[in-house]
């Protein structure tokens, strides 16, 4: 007698919908922008604190200026990246 205990299991169709390319690209760009903002602002704060301690007699303004420079640089890079992504999407259409 041939007892077949292993019955073929039909693969269920994937219910997870894939995102459109433009949405996935936008999410990737935003993730990069936010991480870039965090990293550059932190580096600016670090340089500001170091300059504050070494040169400016422990004043607070160099730290704030460093955060501003870091955030501004991250904003410009994000703006450029998003505009470039928009151009690429328009070129594909």
From Swiss-Prot:
Keywords: Membrane, Mitochondrion, Mitochondrion inner membrane, Transmembrane, Transmembrane helix. The keyword Flavoprotein does not apply. It is a single-pass membrane protein. GO terms for biological process: cristae formation. It is found in: Mitochondrion inner membrane. One of its GO terms (cellular component) is mitochondrial crista junction. The chain crosses the membrane at residues 34-56. Residues 57-93 are mitochondrial intermembrane. Component of the mitochondrial contact site and cristae organizing system (MICOS) complex. Belongs to the MICOS complex subunit Mic10 family. Component of the MICOS complex, a large protein complex of the mitochondrial inner membrane that plays crucial roles in the maintenance of crista junctions, inner membrane architecture, and formation of contact sites to the outer membrane. This is MICOS complex subunit mic10. It comes from Neurospora crassa (strain ATCC 24698 / 74-OR23-1A / CBS 708.71 / DSM 1257 / FGSC 987). The lineage of its organism: Eukaryota, Fungi, Dikarya, Ascomycota, Pezizomycotina. The gene is mic10.
């Amino acid at each position: 007698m041939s007892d077949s205990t292993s019955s073929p299991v039909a693969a269920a169709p994937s219910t997870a919908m894939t995102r459109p390319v433009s949405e996935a690209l936008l999410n990737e760009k935003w993730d990069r922008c936010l991480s870039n903002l965090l990293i550059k602002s932190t580096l600016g704060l670090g340089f500001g604190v170091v300059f504050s301690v070494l040169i400016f007699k422990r004043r607070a303004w160099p730290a704030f200026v460093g955060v501003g420079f870091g955030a501004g640089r991250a904003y410009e890079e994000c703006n450029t990246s998003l505009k470039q992504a928009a151009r690429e999407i328009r070129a594909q259409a």
